């Protein structure tokens, strides 16, 4: 019995000893593990501090990079010519309700043929026009104006950011440039990320092989027509896809001042912008084999006189057109799908005087704030046929066209709701004046009465048989 008890005691002692050793080994293992982690952390803190501190910096940089990427549209707008107030919202869509979100421009392009969403997108764009006008009105101190004098087949200039080779001029810096003289076969090319102001001070450029002015890049280009001056631009009749117009710009174009600009396009468009076109003043006369005025984004006409005599479309725009002031005389071609005004995103007329004459024309939206008369003749009127629209004995619109036309849209402050208007075609005017096919004054006789039509509201559209 004692032997058995002794054996049991020895076995228990061995088990206890083994258990204690196992606990000590396990405890030692955990301790080493903790010690290892702690040492590793300490070593990292002491020996690898730059690496640890770099991690938050990398994370921070990543966040900053993301932030910059989110703002890239605004940055792009600032350097591509969309920094004007009229173009800033679509390019900087960062959740602003007025911009319609990033999908707005795309959806407009996709639905432009059906005309959907145009009323909701036109109004915000119009609200931005006054701010653009204010920016355009800023003046440059005389000491900061650079001069470019065109000397037929050479150029003389004063100021930085200008380079010249023969009759070719390059502008590579922002600023204000006053241009005078003439080039018989040359070009001004602009390539900068800054704003550029071109003061046309009695200048003329003809380029037989391309555009007269070619803006590759600029934040915004403003053309100031100096008081009392007559200026002209003309392109060649050879193919020049890269330029596509007598005056071509990749970015927003603002035209103002009180002088005159005559544009003749022998190959394609008169004035074209891949961004917006804003007309604030001056007298602009465009004669073009293709479109007179063309913009990929918006066109705003706020003042001045714009005359377009175009082989296809008087003015065309892929987004919206708003006519808010001035006098616009727009004449389109005779092909079925061509007209005085063609716009994919919607046309609004809120002021000024409008003559739109062509084979067809986009009808203004109901959101327009000025009364509009639209007449569609069942048979085209021959070229040079006079049309007269009168209220009683008071002539309101009298005009002709160098080409046959079927559609006429007119607007002016004299139109009233519920008033009646008489349309006459043919005949002649004695003693009046004819400017850009619009006739004022004189005595009208010999025309054919085509009927009297009563205004039915803001936009009145009639068929004339």
Protein language model regions, located:
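Bacterial N-terminal signal peptides that target proteins for export
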Residues: 1-8
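Secretory targeting signatures
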Residues: 2, 19-20
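A composition-driven surface/loop motif
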Residues: 8-15, 21-43, 47-55, 60-74, ...
């Amino acid at each position: 019995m004692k032997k058995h008890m002794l054996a049991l005691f020895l076995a228990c002692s061995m088990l206890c000893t083994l258990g204690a050793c196992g606990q000590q080994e396990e405890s030692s293992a955990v301790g080493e593990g903790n010690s290892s982690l702690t040492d590793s952390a300490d070593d990292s803190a002491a020996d690898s501090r730059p690496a640890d501190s770099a991690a938050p910096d990398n994370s921070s940089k990543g966040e900053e990079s993301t932030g910059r990427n989110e703002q890239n549209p605004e940055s792009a707008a600032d350097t591509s010519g969309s920094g004007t107030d009229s173009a800033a919202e679509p390019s900087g869509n960062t959740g602003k309700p007025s911009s319609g979100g990033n999908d707005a421009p795309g959806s407009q392009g996709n639905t432009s043929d059906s005309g959907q969403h145009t009323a909701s997108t036109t109004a915000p764009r119009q609200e931005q026009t006054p701010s653009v006008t204010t920016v355009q009105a800023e003046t440059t101190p005389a000491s900061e104006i650079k001069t470019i004098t065109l000397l037929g087949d050479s150029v003389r200039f004063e100021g930085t950011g200008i380079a010249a080779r023969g009759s070719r001029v390059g502008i590579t810096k922002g600023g204000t440039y006053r241009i005078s003289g003439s080039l018989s076969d040359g070009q001004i090319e602009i390539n900068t990320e800054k704003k550029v102001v071109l003061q046309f001070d009695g200048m003329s450029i003809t380029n037989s092989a391309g555009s007269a002015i070619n803006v590759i890049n600029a934040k915004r280009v403003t053309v100031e027509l100096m008081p009392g001056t007559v200026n002209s631009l003309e392109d060649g009749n050879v193919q020049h896809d890269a330029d596509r117009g007598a005056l071509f710009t990749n970015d927003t174009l603002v035209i103002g001042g009180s002088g005159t600009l005559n544009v003749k396009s022998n190959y394609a468009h008169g004035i074209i912008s891949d961004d917006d076109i804003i007309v604030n003043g001056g007298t602009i006369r465009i004669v073009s084999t293709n479109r007179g005025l063309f913009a990929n984004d918006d066109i705003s006409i706020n003042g001045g006189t714009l005359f377009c005599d175009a082989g296809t479309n008087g003015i065309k725009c892929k987004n919206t057109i708003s006519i808010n002031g001035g006098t616009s005389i727009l004449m389109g071609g005779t092909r079925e799908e061509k007209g005085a005004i063609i716009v994919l995103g919607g046309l609004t007329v809120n002021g000024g005087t409008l003559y739109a004459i062509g084979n067809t024309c986009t009808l203004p939206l109901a959101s327009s704030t000025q009364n509009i008369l639209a007449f569609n003749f069942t048979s085209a009127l021959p070229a040079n046929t006079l049309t007269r629209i009168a209220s009683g004995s008071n002539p309101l619109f009298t005009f002709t066209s160098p080409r046959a036309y079927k559609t006429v849209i007119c607007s002016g402050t004299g139109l009233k709701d519920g008033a009646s208007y008489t349309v006459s075609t043919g005949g002649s005017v004695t003693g009046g004046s004819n400017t850009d096919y619009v006739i004022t004054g004189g005595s009208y006789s010999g025309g054919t009465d085509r009927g009297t039509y009563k205004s039915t509201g803001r936009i009145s559209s009639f068929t004339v048989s």
